[in-house]
């Protein structure tokens, strides 16, 4: 559990949340941070731009628990000048295995092709220079098999953001657990007034 890790000294207490300057600096060569729990896209999108050291200093390993942290989506805008091309573009970006494998190879990102990711795991061409020649798909592909996708709703992303914000104060020792829960409930009801009750697991 995250609080146990924090209390044991496994987490860097100077990093106050995600997507901020502290977090970005924790990925630099000056940092003493040992590891980050990232989704596949975190390597190229987050870690690589913040790293100023040598290639090969980072690697991928199995996580303590399989999880899914969203993905990338493609949508067509109402009023596009090219409505006749929308379907073909979306299919090319989401359902064409050759295109998906190009994305995976260039960005070390896990894409929407189960058989393609399985093949990438055993293909040396998918090794990453940034990861010192490691093929991250050797880890991604088998771990992905165990991810359970819960039903998603229009509220999921907002709830994840708000629970991270509310419990950041708890992890930093500013509030107790019950206060963090209460702060989350307040934040949810402010953002989504139509949600009238929050049920916590027993």
Region spans (language model):
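Conserved C-terminal helix/tail region of periplasmic/extracytoplasmic solute-binding proteins
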Residues: 4-7, 138-202
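Extracytoplasmic ligand-binding clamshell segments of periplasmic binding protein
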Residues: 1-49, 55, 84, 180
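Proteostasis/folding factors centered on peptidyl-prolyl cis-trans isomerases
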Residues: 58-59, 145
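Tryptophan-centric aromatic hotspots in well-structured domains and transmembrane helices
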Residues: 1-2, 23, 41, 58, ...
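Structured segments of extracytoplasmic/periplasmic soluble domains
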Residues: 4-9, 26, 49, 54, ...
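Structural recognition of the beta-strand scaffold that forms the well-ordered cores
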Residues: 34-39, 59-62, 74-76
């Amino acid at each position: 559990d995250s609080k146990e890790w924090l209390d044991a000294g496994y987490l860097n207490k100077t990093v106050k949340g995600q997507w901020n300057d502290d977090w970005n600096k924790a990925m630099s060569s000056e940092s003493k941070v040992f590891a980050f729990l990232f989704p596949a896209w975190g390597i190229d999108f987050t870690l690589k731009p913040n790293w100023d050291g040598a290639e090969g200093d980072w690697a991928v390993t199995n996580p303590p628990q399989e999880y899914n942290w969203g993905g990338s989506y493609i949508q067509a805008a109402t009023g596009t000048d090219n409505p006749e091309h929308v379907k073909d573009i979306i299919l090319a970006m989401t359902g064409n295995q050759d295109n998906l494998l190009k994305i995976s190879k260039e960005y070390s990102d896990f894409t929407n092709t189960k058989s393609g990711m399985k093949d990438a795991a055993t293909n040396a061409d998918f090794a990453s220079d940034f990861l010192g020649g490691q093929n991250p798909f050797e880890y991604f592909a088998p771990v992905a098999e165990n991810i359970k996708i819960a039903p998603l709703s229009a509220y999921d992303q907002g709830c994840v953001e708000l629970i991270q914000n509310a419990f950041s104060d708890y992890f930093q020792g500013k509030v107790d657990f019950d206060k963090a829960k209460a702060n989350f409930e307040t934040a949810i009801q402010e953002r989504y007034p139509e949600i009238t009750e929050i049920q916590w697991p027993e």
